[in-house]
Structures are given as C-alpha cells and as structure tokens.
Amino acid sequence: MSELTTIARPYAKAAFDFAIEQSAVEKWTEMLGFAAAVAEDETVKAYLSSSLSAQKLADTVISICGEQLDQYGQNLIRLMAENKRLSAIPAVFEEFKHHVEEHQAIAEVEVTSAQPLNATQIEKIAAAMEKRLARKVKLNCNVDNALIAGVIVRTEDFVIDGSSRGQLTRLANELQL
C-alpha cells in the first residue's frame, strides 16, 4: 500500500490545492469518495487492470461515476488514466482526506478497547486527546476482546497502550532481562 500512497500524494495534493482555490473542498471530498468506491469494486478493479487504452478506461470510470464527477473530476480521472494510475484512486481519496483534516485542524485518533465504550468514556478520551494534540479530534472506536481490559489509543504520531495485554507483554519482556 505504501507504493500506492506514494503515487497518490501528488494527485491528492493537486486536487486539494485546486479544491481550496475553488472553495469546493466538500464537493471534491464527495467526488473522490465516490470515485474511490467505484475503483474499489472487484469488477472495476479487474477492468482497470486490463490492457485497454487509457482513453477507454477513463471513459468507463467517468461513465460509471456519472454526474458525481464535474469536469475537473473527470480531468483528474483522465490524467490518472493516461499515467496508468487509476488503481490509485482510493489512495488519492485517503490522502485527500488527510489534507482536509490537516486544513481543518482535525486529528484522527483510533481507540481500541476491550469492551464497547460508553458516551462518557468517549467524551473523556476525546477531551484528553484534544488537550494533548491541541486540535479537534475525530475518534474511531473499535473493540478487540484480546486486549483483556483497557484501551489502546493511536494517532499518526504516537501510540498509548493502556491495555492489560500490553502491560503483560511489557512485564514479560522485563522479566526476560
């Protein structure tokens, strides 16, 4: 996936800069999200990996997306097709979202807990992370029963492992020394 991310960065940056310039970030988020969903479809994936011409591939993706893509979105699809990069559309969307979140000063935080968190716990974690990161946060909560108890908090920059499993692993490592 890192190769696709590398490929996607310049397209996402260009699309984001254009969206900012045109005051159309929300529109571009919708367009790229729809195009990414189309490109992730198994039938479309197989079609995109065929040896058809770039023009034919671009026309097909644009046709499937229909009115979801404006002329600028269609131009992006054509450019990516010419460069044989249509398979990177989902990665472009992910990178684009990162630019939007950076622009809006929103940090994405993944919280994995042993049991589902209640609203109070979610609010406390969000408040603590907003204070630590000095920006708004968007929490993505997951449940992993293997943690035994506690939570693991992941951001782009760090991980806080407050799970019982993590504590047991650290204790086992210390005892082996």
Curated annotation (Swiss-Prot):
Keywords: ATP synthesis, Cell inner membrane, Cell membrane, CF(1), Hydrogen ion transport, Ion transport, Membrane, Transport
One function term, GO molecular function aspect: proton-transporting ATP synthase activity, rotational mechanism
Membrane topology label: Peripheral membrane protein
InterPro entries on file: ATP_synth_OSCP/delta_N_sf, ATPase_OSCP/d_CS, ATPase_OSCP/dsu
Pfam family, one: OSCP
Protein's cellular compartments: Cell inner membrane
GO biological process: proton motive force-driven ATP synthesis
GO cellular component: plasma membrane; proton-transporting ATP synthase complex
This protein's record includes keyword Ubl conjugation: no
Residue pairs linked by disulfide bridges in the UniProt entry: none
PROSITE patterns: ATPASE_DELTA (PS00389)
Top-level taxon of the source organism: Bacteria
Functional note: F(1)F(0) ATP synthase produces ATP from ADP in the presence of a proton or sodium gradient. F-type ATPases consist of two structural domains, F(1) containing the extramembraneous catalytic core and F(0) containing the membrane proton channel, linked together by a central stalk and a peripheral stalk. During catalysis, ATP synthesis in the catalytic domain of F(1) is coupled via a rotary mechanism of the central stalk subunits to proton translocation. This protein is part of the stalk that links CF(0) to CF(1). It either transmits conformational changes from CF(0) to CF(1) or is implicated in proton conduction.
Similarity section: Belongs to the ATPase delta chain family.
Assembly mode: F-type ATPases have 2 components, F(1) - the catalytic core - and F(0) - the membrane proton channel. F(1) has five subunits: alpha(3), beta(3), gamma(1), delta(1), epsilon(1). F(0) has three main subunits: a(1), b(2) and c(10-14). The alpha and beta chains form an alternating ring which encloses part of the gamma chain. F(1) is attached to F(0) by a central stalk formed by the gamma and epsilon chains, while a peripheral stalk is formed by the delta and b chains.
Protein name per its UniProtKB record: ATP synthase subunit delta
Originating gene: atpH
